[in-house]
């Protein structure tokens, strides 16, 4: 049999085919809302009747008549009495009531016995235990469909924890599909029933304490509004809660003056606002409301009125199609007889085939008389009213408009003031020096303050900084509660936690985190043992005092041995005048006691000496000493570089394993921080041993703040376990601190938010934008670089300062002073022991100083001699020099009036020059020598040989 499809605007000619009453088609409507200022059901039925009767397509003169009966209360007796009044009128269908479940059940039973169609417009009750009559059709969406739609929304939002508030116990049966989904999954659904007082406040407090963010409310419109009012009083209507209403009159609730704009309130609607008659229908109800109920603003057409409107059209459409196949008629029925309507079954079959578009969307029924193939619109409350963000279709399931939902979330941050909980921690958040003179956010500075300014500029929100009360980041207590900033986020007392808050799995279970804005790890901070301060004589440090003493003894021993060996060996004795060719009886030894002491010094200083060893024995002593000094000097140079160019750090531990394997150095971390949680939950053996030590150590090795830990490191034998970022910050400002080993783990800092925060994605995108623009790195350099200590990565050799090698300058200055003093003593000693004194000692010293200052010629005649030289014998006439004499060195001596020195030199040269071809000055004895031919005993010819021919004094 083909499906029946008819538009509402077409009225066929079936109205003329009514047997018993050819001029009317009678329908009965039972209303349980007699008040004019209520749902407008009476008006909606009248509008449907008038619209059908005025349709130009209607053929014939038959018209639709709707008899309205009122129920004063939900009573089975009164309902049965009303039905007994309806049956004799010969109706083709009974509509309603909309809110009387007991009466609706009696009507269904009576209509089923008489085979008269019955249209329900109220939510179904006791679906599992109530027998559905064949003659009963329900235009209201089933609770099963609503249950599946709610489950789809929870899946879309990845909600794993929710709470269901039930106004009646039947809701557990009505929402069976929803409950079954939570039973087969690991998600948690808590159910709370309203008590007889109908006060939802205790239930809401329990939900708040349980930290449940998603609340499903299954109640009528009035109770749903009451629950929302109480939630607002408890501060539970905020951006961290999501409310889902199962009542289909969600769009009729007034919430603009009730809730925060950021709250996520979702509900369903079945109204088809695109229908051609919907605007006229709503305006008519609004006009009637204004005339009779002007004390309360009109919120919109009630669902029951729209369903009754569609029910009238569904009955008319089915009767039209039935009249095309057979002539039907109606006749009066009685409650006292067993007579039934003979065309009732046929009409029911045609009603199940009806397909039309009504005020509540697509109207179609399945074999059970339930509505099918329709869609529920999913609405979300915004500051501008309700907006559709998706729909749930019976056949197609859930389809959400992610773009609309995301854009709405972004709008929630605009011009919104967020409460930021934080903690005083350098350099993340610090009080300004003049914070007493300021108020609000201006009192603070630091990395987090600058980052908040950047985020607020991108996302266009306002914020208020508030310090956490207990001054900790957050750890779980034995009773399951959390302390610190994490606890404030869980209690919804703050919107953001911006600090050095580490992202951990344990915290992620109770709060949400943004993407990390900084990456770090746990490190070890320890004090640097610099040893004693380098002194002026630190150049002596490469050798121990014992080595220096043995070197001095070795020097004295070598000097004595050299002096002794040089005296014993005959090869160190030689003539001071080699020109005498053996005629001189005087022998000289160059290794006097002074020279023996000086020779090792020259070798030790690697400067050499004018004294050259002649004998094999002295050369042996010299070679051994030079080998000794080579090793000593090389070792000294190597150690000097290590001692003076690099300040060695005396650190007794080099890794975390060294720290765990000893007990002399105490170590700990911040109490209640992520580092403490890391060691507490670690399964690594070394970290477990460290946790056992820290947990059992008395007095406690845990500190309350980073500043306390730094002070403990500097003032005691203590190693502090903290994040690498803080380690770097304090090492930049105190050169006595150093990092031991590498990182123990890898983690990140993130912005904390309450679970289910609707703007987490927006903060994620903003943080990524700051990272791409390098703004976070710029802020880190701004607040981390202290500039007091050099970078540890710079391993270039450090230049030596006066504090390192100043002692050698002291030794040099002292040596120069001693040398000057000794020179003066020698000068005075010579003057005092000279036999002839021409001037005083002071005058002589002044003269010498003047010649030194004026840089005069260093060659001058001796002013003082130890003894008066004897007079020279007169030179014979034949040996007197000629007027001009030429020396072999090219110097000329004039014949006329020469000075005495030149005349004497010329005379001596003339004596030597007799019988010689050349003369010269001996380079050793500084006396004149002549080149004279002498017969050689080995050869017959003559040989030339230099021979000293005079005993004259050496030239000056």
UniProtKB/Swiss-Prot annotation:
Annotated stretches, region: Disordered: 863-889, 931-956
Please list the GO terms describing molecular function.
kainate selective glutamate receptor activity; ligand-gated monoatomic ion channel activity involved in regulation of presynaptic membrane potential; transmitter-gated monoatomic ion channel activity involved in regulation of postsynaptic membrane potential
Residue positions with a glycan: 158, 220, 272, 286, 323, 408, 415, 479, 736
Q: Which Pfam families match?
A: ANF_receptor (PF01094), Lig_chan (PF00060), Lig_chan-Glu_bd (PF10613)
Question: What are its GO cellular component terms?
Answer: cell projection; hippocampal mossy fiber to CA3 synapse; kainate selective glutamate receptor complex; plasma membrane; postsynaptic density membrane; presynaptic membrane
Q: Where are stretches of biased composition, namely Basic and acidic residues?
A: 939-948
Q: Give the residues the record marks as binding L-glutamate.
A: 500, 502, 507, 674-675, 723
Q: Residue ranges, Extracellular compartment?
A: 21-545, 645-804
Q: How does it sit in the membrane?
A: Multi-pass membrane protein
Q: Which GO terms describe its biological process?
A: chemical synaptic transmission; glutamate receptor signaling pathway; modulation of chemical synaptic transmission; synaptic transmission, glutamatergic
Q: Does the keyword Glycoprotein apply?
A: yes
* Family recorded in the similarity comment: Belongs to the glutamate-gated ion channel (TC 1.A.10.1) family. GRIK4 subfamily.
Q: How does it assemble?
A: Homodimer. Can form functional heteromeric receptors with GRIK1, GRIK2 and GRIK3.
The entry's protein name is Glutamate receptor ionotropic, kainate 4
Organism in which the protein naturally occurs: Homo sapiens (Human)
Which gene specifies this protein's sequence?
GRIK4
């Amino acid at each position: 049999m083909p499906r029946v499809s008819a538009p509402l605007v077409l009225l066929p000619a079936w109205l003329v085919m009514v047997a018993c009453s050819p001029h009317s088609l009678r329908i009965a409507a039972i209303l349980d809302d007699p008040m004019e200022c209520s749902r407008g059901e009476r008006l909606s039925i009248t509008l449907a009747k008038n619209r059908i009767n005025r349709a130009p397509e209607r053929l014939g003169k038959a018209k639709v008549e709707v008899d309205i009966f009122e129920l004063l209360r939900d009573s089975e007796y009164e309902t049965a009495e009303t039905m007994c009044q309806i049956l004799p009128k010969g109706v083709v269908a009974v509509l309603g009531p909309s809110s009387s479940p007991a009466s609706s059940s009696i009507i269904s039973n009576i209509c089923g016995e008489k085979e008269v169609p019955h249209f329900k417009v109220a939510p179904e009750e006791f679906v599992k235990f109530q027998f559905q009559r064949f003659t009963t059709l329900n235009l209201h969406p089933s609770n099963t469909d609503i249950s599946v739609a709610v489950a789809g929304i929870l899946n879309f939002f990845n909600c794993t924890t929710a709470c269901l508030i039930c106004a009646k116990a039947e809701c557990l049966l009505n929402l069976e599909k929803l409950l079954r989904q939570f039973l087969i999954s690991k998600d948690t659904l808590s159910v709370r029933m309203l008590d007889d007082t109908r006060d939802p406040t205790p239930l809401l407090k329990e939900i708040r304490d349980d930290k449940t963010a998603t609340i499903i409310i299954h109640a009528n419109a009035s109770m749903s509004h009451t629950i929302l009012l109480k939630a607002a009083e408890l501060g539970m209507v905020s951006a961290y809660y999501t409310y889902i209403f199962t009542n289909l009159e969600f769009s009729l609730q007034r919430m603009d003056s009730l809730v925060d704009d950021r709250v996520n309130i979702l509900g369903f609607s079945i109204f088809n606002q695109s229908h051609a008659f919907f605007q006229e229908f709503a305006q008519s109800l609004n006009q009637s409301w204004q005339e009779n109920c002007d004390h309360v603003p009109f919120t919109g057409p009630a669902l029951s009125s729209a369903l009754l409107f569609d029910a009238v059209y569904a009955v008319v459409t089915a009767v039209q199609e039935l009249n095309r196949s057979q002539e039907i008629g109606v006749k009066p029925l009685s409650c006292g007889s067993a007579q039934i309507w003979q065309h009732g079954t046929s009409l029911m079959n045609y009603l199940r085939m009806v397909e039309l578009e009504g005020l509540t969307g697509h109207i179609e029924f399945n074999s059970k008389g339930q509505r099918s193939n329709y869609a529920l619109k999913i609405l979300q409350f915004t500051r501008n009213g309700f907006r559709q963000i998706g729909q749930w279709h019976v056949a197609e399931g859930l389809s959400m408009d992610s773009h609309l939902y995301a854009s709405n979330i972004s709008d929630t941050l605009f011009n919104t003031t967020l409460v930021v909980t934080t903690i005083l921690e350098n350099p993340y958040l610090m009080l300004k020096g003049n914070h007493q003179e300021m108020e609000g956010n201006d009192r603070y500075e630091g990395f987090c303050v600058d980052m908040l300014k950047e985020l607020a500029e991108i996302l266009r929100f306002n914020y208020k900084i508030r310090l956490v009360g207990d001054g900790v980041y957050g750890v779980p207590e034995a009773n399951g509660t959390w302390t610190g900033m994490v606890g404030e986020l869980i209690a919804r007392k703050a919107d953001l936690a911006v600090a050095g808050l580490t992202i951990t799995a344990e915290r992620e279970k109770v709060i949400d985190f943004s993407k990390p804005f900084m990456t770090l790890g746990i490190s070890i901070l320890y004090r640097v043992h610099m040893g004693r301060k380098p002194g002026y004589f630190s150049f002596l440090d490469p050798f121990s005092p014992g080595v220096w003493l043995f070197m001095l003894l070795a020097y004295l021993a070598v000097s004595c041995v050299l002096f002794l060996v040089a005296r014993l060996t005959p090869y160190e004795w030689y003539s001071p005048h080699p020109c005498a060719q053996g005629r001189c009886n005087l022998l000289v030894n160059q290794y006097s006691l002074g020279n023996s002491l000086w020779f090792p010094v020259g070798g030790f200083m690697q400067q050499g000496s004018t004294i050259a060893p002649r004998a094999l024995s002295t050369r042996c002593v010299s070679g051994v000493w030079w080998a000794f000094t080579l090793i000593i000097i090389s070792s000294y140079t190597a150690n000097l570089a290590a001692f003076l160019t690099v300040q060695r750090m005396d650190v007794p531990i080099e890794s975390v394993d060294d720290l765990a394997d000893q007990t002399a150095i105490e170590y700990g971390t911040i109490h209640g921080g992520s580092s403490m949680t890391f060691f507490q939950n670690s399964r690594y053996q070394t970290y477990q041993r460290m946790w056992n030590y820290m947990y059992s150590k008395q007095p406690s090795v845990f500190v309350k703040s980073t500043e306390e830990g730094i002070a403990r490191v500097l003032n005691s034998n203590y190693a502090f376990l903290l994040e690498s970022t803080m380690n770097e910050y304090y090492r930049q400002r105190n050169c006595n601190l150093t990092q031991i080993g590498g990182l123990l783990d890898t983690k990140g800092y993130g912005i904390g938010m309450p679970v289910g925060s609707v703007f987490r994605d927006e903060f994620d995108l903003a943080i990524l934008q700051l990272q791409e623009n390098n703004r976070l790195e710029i802020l880190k350099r701004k607040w981390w670089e202290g500039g007091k200590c050099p970078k540890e990565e710079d391993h270039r050799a450090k230049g030596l300062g006066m504090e390192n090698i100043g002692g050698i300058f002291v030794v040099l200055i002292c040596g120069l002073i001693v040398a000057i003093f000794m020179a003066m003593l020698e000068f005075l000693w010579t003057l005092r022991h000279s036999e002839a004194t021409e001037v005083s000692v002071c005058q002589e010293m002044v003269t010498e100083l003047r010649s030194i200052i004026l840089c005069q010629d260093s060659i001058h005649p001796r002013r003082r001699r130890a003894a008066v030289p004897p007079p020279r014998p007169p030179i014979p006439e034949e040996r007197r020099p000629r007027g001009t004499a030429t020396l072999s060195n090219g110097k000329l001596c004039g014949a006329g009036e020469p000075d005495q020195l030149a005349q004497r030199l010329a005379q001596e040269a003339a004596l030597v020059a007799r019988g010689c071809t050349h003369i010269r000055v001996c380079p050793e004895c500084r006396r004149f020598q002549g080149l004279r031919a002498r017969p050689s005993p080995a050869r017959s010819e003559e040989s030339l040989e230099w021979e000293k021919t005079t005993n004259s004094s050496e030239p000056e």
